[in-house]
Amino acid sequence: MAAGVIRSVCDFRLPLPSHESFLPIDLEAPEISEEEEEEEEEEEEEEEEEEVDQDQQGEGSQGCGPDSQSSGVVPQDPSSPETPMQLLRFSELISGDIQRYFGRKDTGQDPDAQDIYADSQPASCSARDLYYADLVCLAQDGPPEDEEAAEFRMHLPGGPEGQVHRLGHRGDRVPPLGPLAELFDYGLRQFSRPRISACRRLRLERKYSHITPMTQRKLPPSFWKEPVPNPLGLLHVGTPDFSDLLASWSAEGGSELQSGGTQGLEGTQLAEV
């Protein structure tokens, strides 16, 4: 009985359960043909191209203001070959402006131009030469002059001897020194640009032969010593010792007076003869 009850499953011929997918039916990808896929890809590419064109047009309208639209200049990529040429042209333009405003100018190009290098002294001149040249100019109540202005010095033949007239850049005549002209001509003859004539030099040397130049005077050592600072300052009542200096000056003064007296006697004797 039990054997008859128990039968194999095959005898009942039951339908086998089918294995269904875990995904719902709606989410399953539908089958698409190759033609439809190509059409969809073409549509997507066209949409992307349209979006890129719209973005470029929007950037151009925002970046280009009224100045750029009026000039018609289109912004270029820094990596383009025209960018270095523009930089070179800009640098040449700037250097030209600098040379035009700050460089040396010619009066023919600009009548109001002033050469700042015109008043410069040559490097070959020593400090002593420049000092004495300025001293002469200040004594003549005129500004320091350069080599070109020094060439305009001239001795008037009709005027008295020793009166030197000077012409500046504009032809202005500076008043003469008068009696001091001979002293400056004799004392600064080696530093003055226009050399005096030989006869005039001999006459000046003969006239001032009794005067001992400062470089040839025998001054005492105390003359060349710098003063020592006194701790008491102005309260010190002691006077410095100038005895050796006064002695040397008195000796030189006596010799000069004696030479002047002998010259005066000789002059009177010649006048009497």
UniProtKB/Swiss-Prot annotation:
Residues 67-83 have a biased composition (Polar residues). Residues 28-56 have a biased composition (Acidic residues). Keywords: Developmental protein. Specifically expressed in the stomach, pancreas and intestine. In gastrointestinal tissue, expression is primarily restricted to gastric G cells and duodenal enteroendocrine cells (EECs). Residues 18-84, 253-273 are annotated as: Disordered. One of its GO terms (biological process) is digestive tract morphogenesis. It comes from the Eukaryota. InterPro entries: TEADIR3_omega_loop. Disruption phenotype: Mice were born at the expected Mendelian frequency and do not show gross phenotypes at birth. within the first days of life, mice however display reduced size, low body weight and substantially decreased survival. Examination of fecal pellets and internal organs reveal abnormal digestive-tract function, as well as changes in the composition of the intestinal microbiome. Defects are caused by impaired expression of gastrointestinal peptide hormones and development of enteroendocrine cells (EECs). Disulfide bonds: none annotated. Plays a critical role in intestinal function by promoting the development of enteroendocrine cells (EECs) of the gastrointestinal tract and pancreas. It is thereby required for normal enteroendocrine peptide hormone secretion. This is Protein PERCC1. The lineage of its organism: Eukaryota, Metazoa, Chordata, Craniata, Vertebrata. The gene is Percc1.
